[in-house]
Amino acid sequence: MNKKIDRRSVLLGAGVATVATAATVMSPRPYQAAEKPRQPINFADDMDNVRAYAKLAGTLSDDTVHYWYRGTIYGATPDDTKTMLGFTGLLKMSWKNLGNGSFHYRNYDLGYFTEPDSDVRIEEFTNPFTGITNRPIDIKGGPFDVVITPRQYEWTRSGDDIWFSEAKHFKFANKLSPEEWPTASTGDTLNMLYLDGFNGKVSDLENPELDSAPSILGIHHVNPWYPFFLMGQQPGVNYWHGKGKKIADESDVSPEVMAYVNSKMPGFMSSSAPWVNRTDSYLDYKTHRKPVLE
């Protein structure tokens, strides 16, 4: 397998939109020297293929992995493209091996918004399209459940480097009706495109000493205007672009992000289920904000 493996069929969690205080409760530590012969992966075999997915994105064992992520939100209209805001946070993925080659994982996302290229949380910023002061809401999403089963996920390989990306299309009713939320709502229906993926090494995937391989997360989302931008139904979209790293310990995470998470939700890192009720940014906005009429 030198380039792409056949048939495209993927399943990734919705959440793009994390670490315990001791190394023993971090992600299964991936940075160990191999002591056993490598076990070659037959990517044409559905069982091998999905095991590689689980090992790169998460873990083969019943355990939790965490990603620190950071990126930038851009705005694009028919007339212009502008940098709008930065974002950063921690993604928790609680994995379970279901047997028969299948895996379940549950995502929890906790983070906040920043100036671009910064890890410092901001309370407000000036929207470059409108000139209006916007007040972001913090990022809290999940739990989102995903099951992956044996099939042909699409991989690309270059030497020891290997990666896959997944296109996920979402279409659902907007919790913010345009009648009640004229500036926060983009319409009755939300259409989103997530193009997320993971990069790693074949040598790590074939290392029998590892249950969890080192991984870099790629974040690429095309969304309607986020509610707090107060763009209403003006033509245009947001493009979220970022990277994340499967962490081995707290030293892999920005100190500002660790301080925020420990303050915002103590125990988030060590818990496999830091909260029970499912939430997302639109529900959170509707719960904690009031409509802005103009």
Question: Predicted regions span which residues?
Answer:
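N-terminal secretory signal peptides and thylakoid transit peptides that target proteins
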Residues: 1-18
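Extended, solvent-exposed polar beta/coil surface segments
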Residues: 12, 16, 56, 60-62, ...
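C-terminal segment of N-terminal export signals and the immediately downstream linker at the start
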Residues: 25-59
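Targeting-peptide/extracellular-domain and disordered-appendage signature
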Residues: 44, 70-92, 284-294
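A short, Trp-centered hydrophobic/proline-enriched beta-strand micro-motif
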Residues: 61-71
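Short beta-strand segments that buttress and anchor functional surface loops
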Residues: 71-73, 168, 221
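Predominantly extracellular/secreted and cell-surface proteins with exposed
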Residues: 75, 79-215
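Edge beta-strand at a domain terminus
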Residues: 220-294
